[in-house]
Amino acid sequence: MRNGSGDEHSIVFAPAGVYVRGFDHESPMSPYVEDGVWPGVVDSVPEEFRSCVEDPAFSDDGVTTVTACLWRRTTDESWQTGEIDFPEGHVDPDGADWLFDLLVDRSPEAYVSFAVDYYEVPVDLDSVRHVCALRPLTDDVVRALNTELTLADLAEDIAGIGYPAT
């Protein structure tokens, strides 16, 4: 997920478990600030997920773009992170709190807050609630979320993801 402002996060689901990485381009832990990945962020990523750390999709011109990293193997009882000495004076030094906020708070209200900030347009909360409840899409709901689209415009996308439609 890229926000268009230089920040991103990725989640890799693999047979061994799940690998999550985030990159906050304004973080004091940015590899562009520190001339490389901040110590501890990826140092203890297990072998099962090393290919994710080294994946070119998660780098920019050879620089691994990561400020936050966690993983969970299928055998782990909880999520794991590296041992990191975070920089002082920063409330969210790696950006994890805000990078992953929609993964933690999946409420319609949280999404509307994100969407209004990101797209800089009003977003209809009732329509977002409709979608989050997986109720069948209607023309009214689609138009409330995007006046330039109709339900017919989205038919192929809706069918492709198996979302219910009227």
Which stretches of residues belong to each language-model region?
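Compact, glycine/acidic-enriched structural inserts
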Residues: 23-81, 85
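Sparse, context-dependent recognition of short Cys/His-centered cofactor- or disulfide-binding micro-motifs
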Residues: 3, 55, 139
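Amphipathic, interaction-prone secondary-structure segments
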Residues: 1-18, 23
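Extended aliphatic helical segments
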Residues: 12, 18-20, 33, 37, ...
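A eukaryote-biased signal for long
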Residues: 76-166
